[in-house]
């Protein structure tokens, strides 16, 4: 088992290039199922979840050539429509093959998903919407069995709550359906905008891209021919590196980043005293002598992202005063609190609110990652903790961060990946 050893107290400097967005790449990869021709994807991040989904495509019969940040995919040879437990249990996003498989082939079986253990993230909204489009769905032995013998048809889908994965699944299902699908209360993250633009560039008429209401005219079963897709920059990775600069009171520059996608994080960091130089595709954060406390509430895009909550908690732990952080999207996303407290943070929980009382210093300790973003918060805390911090169970990090320790080391951090002694 691998872990990260961090010796804290080093200032950071220099620049870091932001990788492609995992959460954009996953639905884009799933959407290639809508085509029976070659599709080229560029700027893919080197993370485990991407390799897992590409492996799933090959298990379905697709042909994948993947080298570095580029993948060439041809799903014209798919022979199976069953996404097996062995793959889906590793990564929740595997459920994204449900919509495209069903709309193209009229049937599929997908194992119920796995991934980060951050509360209940049921897929009932996905299934209810697909049923409205004509699917017959049963759940047996841990698998979703879906059939649409006459193909899917357009429908008016009103999501009871905003769901990113549900929106993505229905966009893909609607692309090859017969007739017009209207999605009300759709998610509008940049990753969803990229998926819509990819499908629209292939000839599908989509109105309302970037809004909460989408109208999609399907092709009635005709597969799509996609152009080359360049994955957008990872806004969560970008936010994480801004927090690395913030917590270490360092000046660093992020390259290949879209500032508009991380506006909520920038605004909160500005309220904490940090200043920024923002160019077309780069951002430089400038340090502050005193970190102000912050109050924030996680909410759907364009609000403050739940995927940045843990990282901001690490920064708030070093603030001059008390911060309040409310988690409204997931009920079990404070598992990093006890680990941050092991490093000397002073954090109290009451329901969905964390009260973070800033401390003068943190101290190195052994800590354990519990999910993807929580693990990055522990790394951030380790950057400023006195002594040595060992972050264990970093397979969570590898699911979503492209070479985190390498990029931090290039900025000046004392961080190395090590193997546990047997």
UniProtKB/Swiss-Prot annotation:
Pfam families: EPSP_synthase (PF00275). The modification 2-(S-cysteinyl)pyruvic acid O-phosphothioketal is found at residue 116. GO terms for molecular function: UDP-N-acetylglucosamine 1-carboxyvinyltransferase activity. UDP-N-acetyl-alpha-D-glucosamine binds at residues 92, 121-125, 307, 329. Belongs to the EPSP synthase family. MurA subfamily. The active site is at residue 116. Phosphoenolpyruvate binds at residues 22-23. It comes from Sulfurovum sp. (strain NBC37-1). It is found in: Cytoplasm. It catalyses: phosphoenolpyruvate + UDP-N-acetyl-alpha-D-glucosamine = UDP-N-acetyl-3-O-(1-carboxyvinyl)-alpha-D-glucosamine + phosphate. Gene3D superfamilies: Enolpyruvate transferase domain (3.65.10.10). This is UDP-N-acetylglucosamine 1-carboxyvinyltransferase. Pathway: Cell wall biogenesis; peptidoglycan biosynthesis. One of its GO terms (cellular component) is cytoplasm. GO terms for biological process: cell division; cell wall organization; peptidoglycan biosynthetic process; regulation of cell shape; UDP-N-acetylgalactosamine biosynthetic process. Cell wall formation. Adds enolpyruvyl to UDP-N-acetylglucosamine. It comes from the Bacteria. The keyword Transferase applies. Its EC number is 2.5.1.7. Its main location: cytoplasm. Keywords: Cell cycle, Cell division, Cell shape, Cell wall biogenesis/degradation, Cytoplasm, Peptidoglycan synthesis, Pyruvate, Transferase. HAMAP family: MurA (MF_00111).
